Amino acid sequence: TDSKLYVAMNLSFACSLRMGEILGLTWENVHISDEDIAADNAYVYIDKELTRASKRAIETLGEKDIYYIFTPLMPNTSTRIILKKPKTDSSIRKVWLPKTLAYILREWKKSQDELKGFLGDEYQDFDLVVALPNGRPCEDRIILKEFAKLREDAGLPKVVFHSLRHSSTTYKLKLNHGDLKATQGDTGHAEIDMITSIYAHILDEDRKVNAQKFETAFYAKPDLRSVRPPEEPKEP
């Protein structure tokens, strides 16, 4: 699979990041030193997102919410790729990394630096973690196209990239036994309703399993198969 897609998929699933947050992540906000990893303190800090916006939307957002406007390859285009502040304050957050993902990011940084050295001045360094080979920002349509191809090649059901973030939320709620606040801290949801809804679905699935276990543990016993409910007493 394409390396940047591999990195993006891991960030989405392990860190519960949105697409714009993945594409807007910069290396200055990735903390993966030997000390960080050894102390289980490797993390990414999410404080911006990458998106494409119209000139009018850019004017509406204003300077305080936009960190950077990328120069377009085609000057006459009516939209611009921008790095901007997330929509809600709850989206600004620290998300801790599993060790494996920390090492994946280190290897990715190493290969990115090698490419940067090879291209020299042709590499446009914006400090982006998930970038095109020349360093320029990678738009969501590129990741979505690569993800769709990977899914089709693997013969998997039709799922979208965002499913990884949803699955991440579900998996974390199972692992932490329903710690809604800790999960919300990772996902950056402004309201806890979404997390609660996902957890309610998990509980329903677990309760189905309870019924199956009860069937195996109780009703499947040979001496219980012939048990019948007591007959109603006959009228004298």
Which stretches of residues belong to each language-model region?
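Basic, Lys/Arg- and aromatic-enriched nucleic-acid-binding interface segment
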Residues: 1-19, 23, 37-41, 90-92, ...
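C-terminal catalytic core of tyrosine-transesterase DNA break-rejoin enzymes
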Residues: 10, 14, 21, 142, ...
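Phosphate-coordinating loops and pocket residues in cytosolic domains that bind phosphorylated ligands
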Residues: 24, 32
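Residue-level signal for well-ordered alpha-helical positions
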Residues: 25, 108-111, 175
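Generic structural detector for well-ordered beta-strands
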Residues: 31, 45, 94-96
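C-terminal secondary-structure termini that scaffold catalytic or DNA-interacting sites
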Residues: 33-36, 40-43, 48-89, 101, ...
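Catalytic-site neighborhood detector that most strongly recognizes the C-terminal catalytic loop/helix
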Residues: 38, 48-52, 187-213
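Active-site/catalytic core of tyrosine-dependent DNA strand-transfer enzymes
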Residues: 72-82, 88-156
